Amino acid sequence: MTTDSYLLTVTEVIEETEDARSIVFEVPPELTDTFAYVPGQFLTVAVPSERTGLVARCYSLSSTPHSGRHQITVKRTVDGYASNWLHANLRAGDTLRVLPPSGIFSPKDLDDDFLLFAGGSGITPVMSIARSALEKGSGQVVLFYANRDERSVIFAGALQELAARYADRLVVVHWLESVQGLPSAAQLKAFAAHFTTYTAFVCGPAPFMKAVTDSLKELDFPRARRHQEKFVSLGGNPFGEVEEVLAAQAVLDEVDDGDEEGDEPGAAVVTGPVTVEVELDGEQHTFDDWAGDKPLLEFLEDKGLDAPFSCREGQCSACACMVLEGEVTMRNNEVLDAEDLADGIRLACQSMPASEKLRITYSG
């Protein structure tokens, strides 16, 4: 199963740095509700590909919901097909296929005090959170922003303007590897030690996030006030059999010898019927007929529930839920770490029942 995708027109392309550009989409009035989002969420974009028709990539929204703007920011990477294509080919007036906003890297209360850590292009969702907190919240915002050098600082001008406008609420600390070297665990811990009552959000390269997260743990930041976003490249196709994919498949079918067999679906630990209680959007639902023949996400969709998701491949955290009672097994997991799993967090798109009764919440 897939969700509906939409062709959106690019209204503006902004060159932020030599390697980063922001892309602004026009969302028609009839899709306003469909593309409503909260700070920290992302869009899944279909980037054209001659081989497969498209490749799916998730890019964080760097704009704010209250601005009415839908802007993603893409940093070009050396071996990144999608980012290089978007930098080399995309212009204002072009269209891209896009899925509605998704993701759980979002603050629950904009009035909180925030400690934000961003490394490189990890600033994109963090910028949305910072702007939203400053413009719609009432707390303090502290941003630690690490980059290779001064020329690689995305949103340098915008951050300077925000710091001037909110001088009594915003502190921005720039850390440049070319000047100060990589931030050490001790330096990160010493910095965070001044803000142990704040809610922390971390996004950037994996080593940076690990160093920050380890520092926060040592300072006894509770899990509820520690959030991190991992950037991944999706390997599957969440867009379904759209025109671009069918056209590419037709070309492949011409040379397919037809001898290959598809993979057998993995067997569920429990074949049902399984009883599952689900809390979603503040409402309780109980079902007693999960046969264990499909993942939790698909089962809930069959029941008419609007459960969150994006990639369906276990490569993003959009469908994350918390298992309060019972057990599930995941067919694939590329984003949840050991601490997530210990806390009961699971990916609904990959979760198969491993007990006869389950209690699950999406409000964790």
Set out the residue ranges of the language-model regions.
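Ferredoxin-reductase
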Residues: T2-T95, N147-D149, Q160, E177
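Short, surface-exposed secondary-structure boundary micro-motifs
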Residues: P48-E50, P101-S102, S363
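FNR/FR-type flavoprotein reductase catalytic core
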Residues: N84-P265, T275-E277
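Local cysteine-cluster metal-coordination motifs and their immediate loop/turn environment
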Residues: P125, E301, L305-M330, D340-S355
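Redox cofactor-anchoring modules in respiratory/redox and cofactor-processing assemblies
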Residues: Q228-D302, A318-V323, S351-G364
